[in-house]
Structures are given as structure tokens and as C-alpha cells.
Design a protein with these regions (language model features):
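Repeated loop/turn-to-beta-strand initiation elements of outer-membrane beta-barrel proteins
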Residues: 512-519, 545-551, 603-607
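A short, solvent-exposed loop/turn motif at the edges and junctions
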Residues: 44-46, 71-83
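Structural motif
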Residues: 23-37
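Outer-membrane beta-barrel translocator/channel fold
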Residues: 303-304, 331-340, 544-599
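Transmembrane beta-strand segments that form the barrel wall of outer-membrane beta-barrel proteins
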Residues: 110, 291-296, 483-494, 505, ...
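Structured extracytoplasmic
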Residues: 102, 107-259, 265-274, 334-493, ...
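Extracellular beta-sheet/turn segments enriched in Thr/Pro/Gly and aliphatic residues
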Residues: 85-113
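Short, acidic Ser/Thr/Gly-rich low-complexity loop/linker segments typical of extracellular
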Residues: 47-58
């Protein structure tokens, strides 16, 4: 009952979202050359919400009236802070131009034995790695994910086979989802998908899973999306010095913090490693952001090149969590070329730290004291003690986490476009808008009665060959109704008891708009030698698909094999009896009435009763 109430409330909130947001701030983010900064971050710390701009640089924030400090961030550019006051029902156009970050690099003595200044910083970050790996004791947040894949080049032929004309350059997959993600140590996840949208379909559910794109460089081995069998070595892994070289490219100031920009360089081209940059915050030695790349040289499968960009921000309790993740990829195979991206935005964090506040200062002071000589190559690892938080309170009930990892609202794919427009944090590009419009138009056409009737006229044509091989089906696609009969070899049989047997069966099925369905199967049987008539009927009803609930009632007087698994098929027995003069079929007359009920009560657990 609580679950139903929750989903009802969420749907009401979504439908009323135009009234909830009283003001809009929107604009475009560009660089000094007025080129769009795709997927730049926009963040309001006081509200714990944010967004990213789209591929064309446009962003949009829907907020209540008030005064806010808005941060505009893009890796490699100076963070810009804008204070904005908005009134109720006001729309403000705020275009932003970000300047390239000017990195400062202190003078260092260069000699044959000196190491790059990046190494002491990396050692400090490695020493704190486990602290930050186990830092979030539990959290909940909202996650918006958008995925897009497009073809840019289509070959004329693949392995001498002509490519169909309907396969052409353009978007081939576009999806959005809005979920609530919950986490508790150790590695307990539970996700509720509230809304889902797939271009060209109002029935499909998005494959987006927030828990599946967890990309955590505090782990020794990173393998988000299962990009290869081994995973990839983190640049902060305990043995990362075996795989990487490091170079300090400079430092910059942001909100009173000093951030180091460190280039990570693979020692061997074909190791499962990253290339790019990692940004580390001075004194706390946390990850500030990442700008990484992996390619086929690193052993990545399915795609050619993958770019990973992350931004972190401080949440309640001092815990830093990712607020945005972007996976931008390029692919090429058999002459096809394409690209795409998945962007994940995290908002409304509720976090609880594993450690009391004084734990951080003690550990950080200890590390700083151990490294008074910057070139030292030995740093004591922090011994992570998984201490309880200040209180034993928790966000979740004891039974909240179970075998159910992903729950999908029954109406997740029914969210209307107007609602999506009000809750979507990343504006759609003109290309994406056109894709939704075109594919929705095609879908509406394909779901229309004239179109379905035209298909039925072709598919319902009677064919004697099919009647002998697979039977015959007559369908009303628009009404989602079908009538089917068995193939001839199942209707006409022969056995030594009944002689020639006539055994017709009619299967009637109907599916409704809410995906419930029923099936009615009347069947009769007449043996010419025994001169006996038998009959039975079976009725099944599935009111919904989420829990695979199924009601079934059957009964009648019919011929049944002694082995209930029916190991001998009618056509096989008829052939043996008529051609080999051998009969292996053993049957008896069965009169019965049966009712059954089945339902999944938990993930992997099904309840069934029958009488």
C-alpha cells in the first residue's frame, strides 16, 4: 500500500510540475571563441540540484523564485559564479562565456634524479583512497540519464550483402530515464525508475540503470558497463605506479580550494589503463573531477574510443559525490561509423558519512606530517577503520534492501511529453527533438487502424502449406486479438485404441492496453474406432506483467498419457503405429477440474497454489 501511495504521489507531482517550478533560468554556455561547451555543468549548491547543457551548449534550470548562487563549470575552464534573483513566473536568459583555466606551475629543480611534483600528490591521494572509497555509509539521490547513439557513415554492403535502404545516418537510439537511487554499505543498491522514454516507442522501457554506470576511481579496478573482462586499473590504485607515469600540469583556485591538474600517462600502450587528466584537491586529496579516455589499445570492447568526464561536489556531512558523469564514445565496425553518449545527472542527495568529522582532520594532518619532504617515496597508508557514524540512525528500514535491485513504476513509460519538458534537466538538441517527432509520427501511423488492417490483410492470407506445418492464425492487430488452430498433423492422428482421431483445438487470445491478457482454449477429440467424444477447456488470465500474476481454470473429460510430460508426440506415435506397426502410446481417460494461481512475490521467488 505504501508503494502504491508513493507512486501515486510521484505521478501527481510530475503532472503538477509546471506549477511547482515558478521560475526558469536558461541560456547557452560557450568558450572565448563562442564555441558551445557540450555538457558543461550548472550547479546550485544551496538547493543541491544541477544540470548540464546539451550537445549544442544550451541549458535550462527550473527553480522556485528567490536568489541563488549558480556555478558554471567545465573541465579546463575557470568556474564562473553568477548570483541571480528570479521572481515567480519569470524566465531569465543567462548566457555564459567561460575562460580557459590558467594553470600555475611552481618552479622546480630539474635533474636526473628528481621526480615530477605530481608523484607526492598522487601518493597522498592513494593514501586516502580507501577512506573515500568507504566514506558514503548510505545515500539516496535522484538520477536523470539520457543516452543517444547515432550512425554517421553507413556502407553500401556488409560482407557482400546489400545494406537495407532504411538503415541510414542519423539517431538510431535515444532514451531518457528518471530514477531514485538508494545505496547502503556494503554494496547494497535499490533503484526505482519513475519515468522512462524511448524514442519511437511508448511501450518500451529504457535500459538506463543508474546503479550500472557507477564509475569509481577509488576502487583499484574500474569496470563500469563491463567494458572488458579484466576492468581497468585506477590511477589511484594501490599498485598504480606499475601502470602509470604522472605529470603535474599546474594548479588553480576554485571556491577557496587549490586543485591540482595531473596528467596520467600509461607506461605500456596495451595495458588496461586510462589516459587523460585527474584533478585532486589539495589537503583533502580528494578527486575534484576527471577527464579520461580509453581506447582499443587499452582492451575496451565494442567501441573504439570512450571519453569519461566526471564532476564531484560536496554534499551534506562533508561527503563528496559525483554530480555529473558523461560517457562519450565513438565506434566503427564493418564500415559503419557512429558516436553517442550517456549523461547522468545526480541531484537531491541525502548522504551519511561512515566517519565522524574529526576523523578527516586527524588523517589528513597525519598524511601532511608524513610528507614534509615532498620527494619522499614512502607514504604511510591510512588504516581504514569502518567506524559507525555519530548516530545509528539510517535513511532506510531494515528490510528496504532485498533481492529487488530495480523496480519500475507501472506508468513509467506513460509520462506525457509536457511532463518531460518540465522535469528534463538537460534540454534536447534540435537533432534529438526532430528524432522524437519523426519516430513518434511513425509510431502513431503504425499503431493506426488502417495501417494495422493493411498488415492483417497480408498476414491473414490462408496458406495450405502453413496449415500443414505450423497451423493457421487469424489476427486483428488493432484490437490485439488472435485466433489460432493447430497444424493438420496434430489435428488428425492415429493410435491403436481410438483408431483414426480427429482432435481440433481453437486458441483465442486478447491483449488489453494495460498489458493484461486472457487466453481461451476449447478442444474436442473424437476417436472413430472407439466412437467416443472428449472435450476440455482451458482459460487463463494475466492481469499484469510486473509480477507475472496468472490465474488459470481448466476442466473436462479427455485422453491423457500416463506420463504427464507427454514424451510421445501425436505425429511420432502415428508414424510408428502405421509404418512400423508398433504402439508405444499409453493413455487413459481423465475427468478433472483444476484451478491455479501464480505470482512473483520477490525477485526470484514465485508463489503458486492449485486445487
Amino acid at each position: 500500500m505504501k508503494t502504491i501511495t508513493f507512486y501515486t504521489l510521484m505521478c501527481c507531482l510530475l503532472l503538477c510540475s509546471n506549477q511547482l517550478f515558478a521560475a526558469i533560468i536558461k541560456g547557452r554556455i560557450v568558450n572565448e571563441n563562442n564555441a558551445p561547451l557540450s555538457f558543461a555543468n550548472v550547479y546550485i549548491k544551496s538547493l543541491n540540484i544541477g544540470t548540464t547543457c546539451n550537445d549544442d551548449g544550451f541549458y535550462e534550470l527550473k527553480i522556485d523564485a528567490g536568489k541563488y548562487d549558480i556555478y558554471f563549470q567545465y573541465i579546463g575552464y575557470k568556474t564562473k559564479l553568477e548570483s541571480v534573483s528570479v521572481k515567480k513566473d519569470e524566465t531569465i536568459l543567462l548566457n555564459i562565456k567561460l575562460e580557459s583555466e590558467k594553470y600555475t606551475l611552481k618552479e622546480v629543480d630539474v635533474n636526473a634524479t628528481a621526480e615530477d611534483p605530481a608523484y607526492p600528490i598522487i601518493r597522498q591521494a592513494m593514501a586516502m583512497r580507501k577512506v573515500y572509497l568507504f566514506e558514503p555509509k548510505e545515500y539516496s539521490c535522484n538520477v536523470y540519464i539520457k543516452g543517444m547513439q547515432r550512425l554517421t557513415t553507413v556502407p553500401k554492403r556488409v560482407l557482400l550483402i546489400k545494406v537495407p535502404p532504411e538503415i541510414k545516418p542519423g539517431i538510431i537510439y535515444l532514451t531518457e530515464s528518471y530514477s531514485e537511487l538508494n545505496y547502503q554499505q556494503p554494496e547494497k543498491f535499490k533503484e526505482k525508475m519513475i519515468s522512462s522514454k524511448v524514442s519511437g516507442s511508448n511501450k518500451a522501457f529504457s535500459f538506463n540503470r543508474a546503479s550500472a554506470i557507477k564509475f569509481n576511481l577509488y576502487e583499484n579496478i574500474v569496470n563500469s558497463y563491463k567494458l572488458n573482462e579484466r576492468g581497468f586499473v585506477s590511477p589511484l590504485a594501490s599498485d598504480a605506479f606499475l601502470s602509470y607515469k604522472y605529470k603535474l600540469d599546474g594548479e588553480f583556485k576554485e571556491n577557496g580550494l587549490t586543485v591540482f591538474k595531473i596528467k596520467i600517462i600509461p607506461k605500456r600502450e596495451h595495458d588496461p589503463v586510462f589516459r587523460g587528466y585527474i584533478y585532486i584537491v589539495k589537503d583533502s586529496w580528494r578527486i575534484h573531477s576527471t577527464d579520461l579516455m580509453i581506447s582499443k589499445l587499452s582492451g575496451v570492447e565494442f567501441i573504439d574510443t570512450l571519453y569519461i568526464k566526471q564532476n564531484y561536489a560536496e554534499q551534506e556531512g562533508g561527503v563528496w559525490m559525483p554530480v555529473s558523469q558523461r560517457f562519450i564514445f565513438q565506434l566503427e565496425a564493418y564500415g559503419f561509423r557512429g558516436n553517442g553518449y550517456f549523461v547522468a545527472l545526480y541531484s537531491k542527495y541525502k548522504t551519511r558519512s561512515m566517519y565522524p568529522n574529526e576523523f578527516y582532520s586527524k588523517q589528513q594532518n597525519k598524511i601532511i606530517a608524513d610528507q614534509r619532504v615532498p620527494e619522499t617515496k614512502k607514504v604511510e597508508r591510512v588504516k581504514v577503520v569502518k567506524r559507525k557514524a555519530k548516530t545509528d540512525t539510517t535513511f532506510f528500514d531494515k528490510k528496504f534492501f532485498n533481492n529487488e535491485l530495480l523496480a519500475i513504476d507501472k506508468k513509467a513509460n506513460k509520462t506525457v511529453d509536457a511532463t518531460w519538458d518540465s522535469v528534463r534537466p538537460v534540454p534536447l538538441t534540435s537533432e534529438e527533438l526532430l528524432d522524437y517527432k519523426q519516430k513518434d509520427s511513425v509510431r502513431i501511423l503504425e499503431e493506426s487502424k488502417p495501417y494495422m488492417d493493411s498488415l492483417d490483410r497480408v498476414n491473414n492470407k490462408f496458406d495450405w502449406a502453413n496449415l500443414f506445418i505450423s497451423g493457421y492464425t487469424f489476427g486483428h492487430s488493432f484490437y490485439k486479438k488472435k485466433y489460432s488452430i493447430k497444424p493438420i498433423y496434430s489435428i488428425i492422428q492415429y493410435n491403436t485404441v481410438e483408431g483414426l482421431v480427429f482432435n481440433p483445438e481453437l486458441r483465442i487470445s486478447k491483449t488489453f492496453d494495460d498489458y493484461s491478457k486472457y487466453e481461451l482454449v476449447p478442444e474436442c477429440r473424437y476417436g472413430f474406432a472407439s466412437n467416443r467424444v472428449y472435450g476440455r477447456i482451458n482459460f487463463s488470465y494475466e492481469p499484469e506483467q510486473f509480477y507475472y500474476t496468472r490465474w488459470n481454470v481448466s476442466g473436462g473429460s479427455f485422453v491423457q498419457q500416463f506420463n504427464g510430460d507427454v514424451p510421445i508426440t501425436p505425429i511420432l506415435n502415428s508414424a510408428y503405429t502405421l509404418l512400423a506397426k508398433q504402439n508405444y502410446l499409453k493413455e487413459f481417460q481423465k475427468e478433472y477440474i483444476k484451478a491455479s494461481f501464480g505470482r512473483n512475490i520477490l525477485n526470484g521467488v514465485r508463489m503458486s497454489v492449485s486445487a
